[in-house]
UniProtKB/Swiss-Prot annotation:
Gene3D superfamilies: 6.10.140.140, Classic Zinc Finger. The gene is ZNF705D. This is Zinc finger protein 705D. Pfam families: KRAB, zf-C2H2. It is found in: Nucleus. InterPro entries: C2H2-ZF_domain, KRAB, KRAB_dom_sf, Znf_C2H2_sf, Znf_C2H2_type. One of its GO terms (molecular function) is RNA polymerase II transcription regulatory region sequence-specific DNA binding.
Length: 300
């Protein structure tokens, strides 16, 4: 095996322009961060030295990656426009060296289940391959091309994934429970619920998680970090979701309304509890007497 040298984002990068980034919704951007950090974790486990660039630090902190370039890209000077556009591109590519061993297997890599042809050699990247495995033998500068429509697939985070356009449905199905997903990343994450796999472990307490984002969130409980602060009352939270939920208490918003009783709730947990009461489900059973309850609070 070749020696594993220091790798940076700039070595091999497939980029998104500002316009493409703007077209991605919040879930796609979150998926991008999770995928990139997972790929970084894989490379570290294989012995690569990862250079912590500005973009990686931004990823780990969950910050918005695009803050510049909106005005500069309209410059009339073609050379300056090209240089600035390149400067403000966003790296969207796993950090992998061209000379790495092709015999390495990455079970946790993203699996491509649509046939794509790689431009460098014309090899097929079918469902048995992975994005990272394919890129081990190429420079990463040329995108995969869909055989069905001939358009380039920069990666799974394109505003409209080519696979979904061709099939017009949920193309990735679990072979254990038949639950289907529009993205193979979500399918792989779902399969962990069947296997019990928890690849991301906290180095302080040993608690393990299925997603690296959950591990990062957990680590903040050790450090006491609460980066999300309410501007009205000053209360701080570990997760942005909890801050948004808290802000609804100031606004009096109740986003979840029961279609049977008309009762509204500010939190989805209260809405789900109300729904369980309507259908008569009692999922929380006492281990001592067997009596069951609709709400976990009633069991306690």
């Amino acid at each position: 095996m070749h020696s594993l040298e220091k790798v940076t984002f700039e070595d091999v990068a497939i980029d998104f322009t500002q316009e493409e980034w703007d077209m991605m919704d919040t879930s796609k951007r979150k998926l991008y961060r999770d995928v990139m950090l997972e790929n970084i974790s894989h490379l570290v486990s294989l012995g690569y030295q990862i250079s912590k660039s500005y973009i990686i630090l931004q990823l780990e902190q969950g910050k918005e990656l695009w803050r510049e370039g909106r005005v500069f890209l309209q410059d009339q000077n073609p050379d300056r426009e090209s240089a600035l556009k390149k400067k403000h591109m966003i790296s969207m590519h796993p950090i992998i060296r061209k000379d790495a061993s092709t015999s390495m297997t990455m079970e946790n890599s993203l699996i491509l289940e649509d046939p794509f042809e790689y431009n460098d050699s014309g090899e097929d990247c079918t469902h048995s391959s992975t994005i990272t495995q394919c890129l081990l033998t190429h420079s990463g500068k040329k995108p995969c091309v869909s055989k069905q429509c001939g358009k380039s697939l920069r990666n799974l985070l394109s505003p409209k994934p080519r696979k979904q356009i061709h099939t017009k449905g949920k193309s990735y199905q679990c072979n254990l429970c038949e639950k289907a997903y529009t993205n193979c990343f979500y399918l792989r994450r779902h399969k962990m619920t069947h296997t019990g796999e928890r690849p991301y472990a906290c180095h302080l307490c040993g608690k393990a998680f299925t997603q690296c984002s959950h591990l990062r969130r957990h680590e903040k409980t050790h450090t006491g970090e609460r980066p999300y602060k309410c501007h009205q009352c000053g209360k701080a939270f570990i997760q942005s979701f909890n801050l948004r939920r808290h802000e609804r208490t100031h606004l009096g918003q109740k986003c979840y309304e029961c279609d049977k009783s008309g009762k509204a709730f500010s939190q989805s947990s209260g809405f789900r509890g109300n729904k369980i009461i309507h259908i008569g489900e009692k999922p929380h059973a006492c281990l001592l007497c067997g009596k069951a309850f609709s709400l976990s609070s009633d069991l306690r």
